[in-house]
Structure formats: C-alpha cells, structure tokens
Amino acid sequence: MAQAQYAGTGRRKNAVARVRLVPGTGKITVNKKDVEEYIPHADLRLIINQPFAVTSTEGSYDVFVNVVGGGYAGQSGAIRHGIARALLQVDPDFRDSLKRAGLLTRDARMVERKKPGLKKARKASQFSKR
C-alpha cells in the first residue's frame, strides 16, 4: 500500500512553494537539498518550522519542497504557508490553531512598483525651493 502523502501550495511575495508531507522523522528537503544547506539563516529556518510547533507535530513528517521565485525570506514564508495548508489535510482540527497563529493567511504584501520620475517606489530627488 502506498504511503500517505499530503500536499499544499504556499505563496509569499514572488515565491511559490509546492510542499509534500510524508510521515517520517522530520527531515526537510528544499529543492533536493537539506534545509540547512539551502537556507543559510537560522531565523528563516525557524519560520519554516512554525506550523509544526503550533500543531505539536515536530519530527512527525518528512517535508519535500519545490520552491521557485523570490529570495530567502519570501521562499521561507511560502514554505511555511504550504506546510500549514498540507497539515490541514493531515487533520482538519488543526485549522483553529493554525488560523489563530496566522499561518493560513496569504501575506498579501507585495513590493511597491517604481513610479516614473522617482528613483525608487517613493524615493524622490531632493526638493529645492529655489
């Protein structure tokens, strides 16, 4: 019999993460690399583990992630969102705790576009009265 798999898609900024959860030992693989190798910042790795901490399922599932787009922070947020959605498939009772922790909400903040005549989205050249 095939092993149970749970899937979830997470998004944050320009990053999209496709996440698969398989019952296992808690190993996280991102783009065929270990998470410590792929994401060098420890604080971003903590973000990835938040859904497991909230639902008390640390070490229960192996995580396989395929993530594209964005940087480390956006990808970490997308992975967290995908794991939270996949955990909902594992047990729908997790919805309340995940929702209360804000892990099911898609973070809608995006980079503001650059405006013509300005140097960046809001940075203008210095104003001279005379």
From Swiss-Prot:
GO cellular component, one term: cytosolic small ribosomal subunit
Keyword Ribosomal protein (UniProt): yes
Gene name as annotated: rpsI
Entry keyword set: Ribonucleoprotein, Ribosomal protein
InterPro entries membership: Ribosomal_Su5_D2-typ_SF, Ribosomal_uS9, Ribosomal_uS9_bac/plastid, Ribosomal_uS9_CS, Ribsml_uS5_D2-typ_fold_subgr
Family from the record: Belongs to the universal ribosomal protein uS9 family.
Protein name: Small ribosomal subunit protein uS9
A Pfam cross-reference name: Ribosomal_S9
GO molecular function, one term: RNA binding
Any single GO BP term: translation
The species this protein was found in: Streptococcus equi subsp. zooepidemicus (strain H70)
PANTHER family with a match to the protein in the record: RIBOSOMAL PROTEIN S9 (PTHR21569), SMALL RIBOSOMAL SUBUNIT PROTEIN US9M (PTHR21569:SF1)
